């Protein structure tokens, strides 16, 4: 069995309780899946929290600015797209040799696509869908059946089935009342807890409900849920897998704000709970179209250029501003100058970047109260179809892909969510003559970080077999392990106040990243929203930033951006 590894210490995202077997599931038809975003999408702008779904920006009429963005993840690229649309000049610097950050992927020496994690697109990802439509990537999404599937030990399947023509909130009520993942008593107590939540207010007053949800940041979801009559069994069998999938931590450790933010959208928007996945790898089908849009608009990517130091000074009035950023690529070193600097990093990345003196400002110091969660992503390629449990003969043939085509949750393994990418993202992951490609996310990843690849792969292989006993006898042909030391920030109780605004006390320095202040959780959607917010701050400060450029010219002419030493001349284009 071949295997590969990638270690990344920080990245620059029935009734009556009786379970049923797979005969309740609809098998996938590999090439007949809806993909357009023009269908099966709720209008998120109607009766929705404005913080989550901001209106389109007004046309910018201020001075053109030269912007340097550190980080080519979703947050950085979202910022770049918004600024380029408003006529600014943008350069993006990325220390890796590929873009995408936590949603990045690359091809190894054997031609396998390696991802940083399992990427699922909830129907409430309005800002990300907006970006994808803008860059022409909307047709790259495959719509899955509108059901959330739980795979329990022994191959028992539980569901939250949202397939009801009446829509929200009735489809959600039906899903929770008829789920076979919980026993009747737990379902009843679950219904009581949700009925006593801000989710109900969201039906008539979404902004008020959003404020109520923010106010619950200082309590864990478990404490909130149990206080409202929910049961520990509901947490263990349903909500923990969901919490792990969303934030990589369990309900005892995740803020009630995070879970209830999602619940409020599921309750009010029919398609918010509808899942999509990319038709293939993120680098090809997500980052690729965004990169093309940026370069077509005149933006520039500079890969393998890392920021070593932020250089700054003070004006006569005491205002701090950046004079340049010291960049390096292998043994090459350059000084990059711009009108505006955006740090689109993750939590460990921004901690390394901020000058220690800036911690005198609470906005920067508070970042050090945030920590990332370790996560391990494992890929296992089989010589048959792991999730096909009804027909043993079909699971052994390699002429056509069969099995469960969706995101899958489980409460009975160290990986909370997983998918067979050969089914769910077939363009790059279905290989003729081979079988399932199980991609599983180990959360929390702490116990796995020090383990060697072979030990991790063997543990995951055994747990997959526990979930799918019918896969006994299938062999693992190939595997990969990706370790990320700090991924999403740990969204524990009381951490939301420490998330920084995109606008900082440093006049020409802005932040982007899913950890920054925005009403969604740390996620692809959160990263995209943070980029929109950062760009909005920059455009609203356009006149002031142009005035700062003039003042620097008057007070420190040696710090000017001159045509002979501009960024595009200093760095090779990619």
From Swiss-Prot:
Pathway annotation: Carotenoid biosynthesis; lycopene biosynthesis
- InterPro entries hit by this protein: Amino_oxidase, FAD/NAD-bd_sf, Zeta_caro_desat, Zeta_carotene_desat/Oxidored
Q: Which UniProt keywords apply?
A: Carotenoid biosynthesis, Chloroplast, Chromoplast, FAD, Flavoprotein, NAD, Oxidoreductase, Plastid, Transit peptide
The record lists the catalysed reaction(s) as: 9,9'-di-cis-zeta-carotene + 2 a quinone = 7,7',9,9'-tetra-cis-lycopene + 2 a quinol
Domain of life per record: Eukaryota
**Where does this polypeptide localize?**
Plastid, Chloroplast; Plastid, Chromoplast
Q: Which GO terms describe its biological process?
A: carotenoid biosynthetic process
Q: Which family does it belong to?
A: Belongs to the zeta carotene desaturase family.
The free-text function statement in the UniProt record for this protein reads: Catalyzes the conversion of zeta-carotene to lycopene via the intermediary of neurosporene.
Q: What is this protein called?
A: Zeta-carotene desaturase, chloroplastic/chromoplastic
This protein's species is Narcissus pseudonarcissus (Daffodil)
The coding gene here is ZDS1
């Amino acid at each position: 069995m071949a295997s590969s590894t990638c270690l990344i210490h920080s990245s620059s995202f029935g009734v009556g309780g009786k379970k049923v077997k797979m005969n309740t599931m609809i098998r996938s038809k590999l090439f007949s899946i809806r993909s357009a975003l023009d269908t099966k999408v709720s209008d998120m702008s109607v009766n929705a929290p404005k913080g989550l779904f901001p209106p389109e920006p007004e046309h910018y009429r201020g001075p053109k600015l030269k912007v340097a963005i550190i980080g080519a993840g979703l947050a950085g690229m979202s910022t770049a797209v918004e600024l380029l649309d408003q006529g600014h000049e943008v350069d993006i610097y990325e220390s890796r040799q590929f873009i995408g950050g936590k949603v990045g992927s690359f091809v190894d020496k054997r031609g396998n696509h390696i991802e940083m994690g399992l990427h699922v697109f909830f129907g409430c990802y309005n800002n990300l869908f907006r970006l994808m439509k803008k860059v022409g990537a909307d047709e790259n999404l495959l719509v899955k059946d509108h059901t959330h599937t739980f795979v329990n030990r022994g191959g028992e399947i539980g569901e939250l089935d949202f397939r009801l023509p009446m829509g929200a909130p009735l489809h959600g009520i039906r899903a929770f009342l008829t789920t076979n993942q919980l026993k009747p008593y737990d379902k009843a107590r679950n219904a009581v807890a949700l009925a006593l939540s801000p989710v109900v207010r969201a039906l008539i007053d979404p902004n008020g409900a959003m404020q109520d949800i923010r106010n619950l940041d200082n309590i864990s979801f478990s404490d909130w849920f149990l206080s409202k009559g929910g049961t520990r069994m509901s947490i263990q069998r349903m909500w923990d897998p969901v919490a792990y999938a969303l934030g990589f931590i369990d309900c005892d450790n995740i803020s009630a704000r995070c879970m209830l933010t999602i619940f409020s959208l599921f309750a009010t928007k029919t398609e918010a709970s509808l899942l999509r996945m990319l038709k293939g790898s993120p680098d090809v089908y997500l980052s690729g179209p965004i990169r093309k849009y940026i370069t077509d608009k005149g933006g520039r990517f500079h890969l393998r250029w890392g920021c070593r130091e932020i250089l700054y000074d003070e004006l006569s009035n005491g205002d701090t501003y950046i004079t340049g950023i010291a960049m390096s690529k292998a043994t090459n070193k350059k000084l990059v100058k711009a009108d505006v600097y955006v740090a689109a990093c993750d939590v460990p990345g921004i901690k390394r970047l901020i000058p220690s003196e800036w911690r005198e400002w609470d906005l920067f110091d508070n970042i050090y109260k945030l920590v990332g969660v370790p996560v391990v992503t494992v890929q296992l390629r089989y010589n048959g179809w792991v999730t096909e449990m009804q027909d043993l003969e079909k699971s052994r043939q390699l002429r056509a892909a069969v099995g469960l085509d969706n995101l899958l949750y489980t409460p009975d393994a160290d990986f909370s969510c997983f998918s067979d990418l050969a089914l769910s993202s077939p363009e790059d992951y279905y290989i003729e003559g081979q079988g399932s490609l199980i991609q599983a996310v180990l959360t929390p990843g702490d116990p796995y970080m020090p383990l060697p690849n072979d030990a991790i792969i063997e543990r995951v292989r055994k747990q997959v077999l526990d979930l799918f006993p019918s896969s006994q006898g299938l062999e693992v042909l190939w595997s990969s392990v990706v370790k990320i030391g700090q991924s999403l920030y740990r969204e524990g109780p009381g951490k939301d106040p420490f998330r920084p605004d995109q606008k900082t006390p440093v006049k020409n320095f802005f932040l982007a990243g899913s950890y920054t202040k925005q009403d969604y959780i740390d996620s692809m959607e959160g990263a995209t929203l943070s980029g929109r917010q950062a760009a909005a701050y920059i455009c609203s400060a356009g006149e002031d930033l142009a005035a700062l450029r003039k003042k620097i010219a008057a007070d420190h002419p040696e710090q000017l951006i001159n045509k002979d030493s501009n960024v595009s001349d200093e760095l090779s284009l990619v």
